[in-house]
């Protein structure tokens, strides 16, 4: 009563509108005000930021997922049926309609408008129910309207994916991913979010939420968020192996930030089985002058060609392909490669150089 001052209590929808419309932005603003206050009090080292993430399950139905591959398959099957229907329509109505994949929705709408005009000119009577015979005009109009309705749904799905492979109907922003807490141990996919947190001197200085399940694609946008919200750039960044990529290393070098990112193969390097695996690049000799690797059998793997790979974010990396001179009759081939031909190595020199720099930073 004291809080309301005798006024009527707000209902649940009013509270929900306040939470979604005002509270989220206000809480974020208050949070970063506190971070800036900590900076003023010299409670932050401002030397390195420690980044880690976790998965949070969304408050959404677990069984309302839509998969991009499934939508593409259904859409392709319907497109073939549309092509057959358009060919029949052109033959019967002496028209030259066509439907392309790029403008299929617009093309189907044009066909529907044409049939509606024909129905109006010929005063077509629409019938429904058992025992009624539908006219040719009605059959074609209903058919293409169904196509248009389904295509509209597929377009909605495609727009909702936003570069993802799936989304949840009851929470379109959520992505289906493996949670860290898997009590049933069945690797069930659940709708959730990837939450990233930055820590400095035991204080959380930044937090952000992402749709991507992989930490690799969250590092760069999260660092940009930290710099924008906190107001300064950290000289060094510490993260686990889930954040390692050539793109991340390149970005940190451009921003003059020192990387302390654990290599993805760091734990494998310690194992005896890895050290005895003759197929691994790390266990081969290397001649810097000739740029060749020496395999367990003493044969050279020479650079064959350089290919370019582009990540989903658009980053382009160069990969050098090395091939052994001749693996025919080699007694170690079964342990060295599964390829029918000669042994090949795919190596990004830029990535290895940047990884070594980060590894040396950790050891220092």
Region locations from a protein language model:
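Anion-binding and metal-coordination hotspots
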Residues: 3-364
